[in-house]
């Protein structure tokens, strides 16, 4: 039952997600592609977590943050992808009102945690390159745990903020969501409440949050680049810069998509374009991060070789 009639007011109890396409053949193709990407995402990020856990040489702050980034990537992808895969195989792509809120809050939680973790990793690189002699002191286990805990608290606050707005909206119909998951923007379009003030508050908050965390990342890299330029040897500069390229690539991909979806004016792009970029943000980035950090990191590649070598000896 999609609606409850309460006197003169109709309340929506479930929503229909329109998804990516109505074409049955294309649905099957997308199901196969997205399922493969999701399985690789889970395998890649889980392998990263396990490799860091069993390799003593990877028990450093940078890899501590990386293991949490991998778990957050799995959570972000898992908050949307399983439901999307089920909807590819069913004719009526419905999700309950409560399920929609849970999906939205999960995506908001993991998305915000990733912001803070990327900022923490930028600080880690700043200390490692600009203050190497004080690295063990400034990036102690206690500091790392506090930074990660702060990231999860920030994610919880963001999820609470977004969830509060969602459950404060009234939905009287229609109930067809023009997206593949319950994102806040298409949900506001369906609300029969006056969302004009909420839309301004949410847009301002999203823009401020994104640009503030980006600023926190840019400032450390400004000092990092100055320090790298002062290194006389070409080999030294390349080695110092190589430790930052993976993180910079991840930051560029993540912030580029977030700014497009949540910061740029809605009039500058269509809903279909928003779906494509959201798919990249929810599905492609989580599968790319393990590749970005492993292919450009000799320590991870060496640790992986050691694990394979040990298994061949057993």
UniProtKB/Swiss-Prot annotation:
It is found in: Cell membrane. The chain crosses the membrane at residues 29-49, 58-78, 103-123, 137-157, 200-220, 241-261, 275-295. It is a multi-pass membrane protein. Residues 1-28, 79-102, 158-199, 262-274 are extracellular. Residues 50-57, 124-136, 221-240, 296-314 are cytoplasmic. InterPro entries: GPCR_Rhodpsn, GPCR_Rhodpsn_7TM, Olfact_rcpt. GO terms for cellular component: membrane; plasma membrane. Pfam families: 7tm_4 (PF13853). Keywords: Cell membrane, Disulfide bond, G-protein coupled receptor, Glycoprotein, Membrane, Olfaction, Receptor, Sensory transduction, Transducer, Transmembrane, Transmembrane helix. GO terms for molecular function: G protein-coupled receptor activity; olfactory receptor activity. GO terms for biological process: G protein-coupled receptor signaling pathway; sensory perception of smell. Glycans are attached at residue 6. Potential odorant receptor. Belongs to the G-protein coupled receptor 1 family. This is Olfactory receptor 5P62. The gene is Or5p62.
